[in-house]
């Protein structure tokens, strides 16, 4: 068994245990393997171990992998900051984007999404910690942004994403994740019909699952320590 395969098994076991502790079905939770800085060969090894969904932060690096792995039925998620000049590449090559935080970026993605492809699945990135250095829309601005994105053709608004500040304080982690879950619930009370909470990484996935995560973004625990970009 390869290291990546054994790592995937361990992460899946963590997700399943956390889900059971929360009274949830583990099948509700998608493991997104974050492959930024790792080679296409390592993504291929993860696919051989049953992994289909992969997350990337850097467009040029991701495009090379998407081309190299085009023989595999992979689902590609863009999870990094979105530059205006990269929206066409994202819209043309990815299945999901988790990091939409501005209406003009959403418009550019919609304009560039090829008509022959399924709608681009979109999550809004929310700055749940209030840190000026963090990307994301402020919680009070989520609803108008959601309305704008929902109205765009070729995009499908699915939910919310957050990257809270790193912390060993489990209660702080839970508050951040709970805040995102409550925002989603508020949108759904207004009829948005969203089903996705993208939150939780290698160090805090259990807390995220407890608070309702449906996608956990796992890099280090799958591929090992991050290589230099």
Locate the predicted segments by residue:
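Conserved alpha/beta-domain cores
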Residues: 1-203, 209-211, 225
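Gly/Pro- and small hydrophobic-enriched strand-loop and loop-to-helix capping segments
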Residues: 213-229
């Amino acid at each position: 068994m390869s290291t990546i395969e054994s790592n995937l098994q361990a992460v899946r076991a963590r997700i399943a245990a956390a889900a059971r502790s929360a009274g949830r079905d583990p099948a509700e939770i998608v493991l997104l393997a974050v492959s930024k800085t790792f080679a296409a060969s390592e993504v291929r090894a993860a696919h051989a171990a049953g992994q289909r969904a992969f997350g990337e932060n850097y467009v040029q690096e991701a495009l090379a992998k998407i081309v190299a792995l085009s023989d595999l039925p992979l689902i590609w998620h863009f999870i990094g900051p979105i530059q205006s000049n990269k929206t066409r590449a994202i819209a043309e090559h990815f299945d999901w984007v988790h990091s939409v935080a501005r209406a003009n970026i959403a418009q550019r993605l919609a304009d560039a999404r090829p008509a022959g492809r399924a709608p681009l699945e979109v999550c809004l990135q929310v700055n749940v910690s209030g840190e000026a250095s963090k990307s994301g829309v402020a919680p009070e601005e989520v609803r108008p942004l959601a309305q704008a994105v929902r109205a765009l053709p070729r995009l499908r608004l699915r939910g919310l994403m957050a990257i809270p500040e790193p912390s060993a304080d489990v209660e702080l982690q839970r508050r951040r994740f709970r805040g995102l879950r409550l925002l989603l619930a508020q949108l759904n009370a207004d009829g948005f019909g969203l089903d996705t909470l993208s939150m939780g990484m290698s160090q805090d996935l259990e807390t995220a699952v407890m608070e309702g995560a449906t996608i956990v973004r796992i890099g280090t625990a799958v591929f090992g320590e991050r290589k230099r970009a």
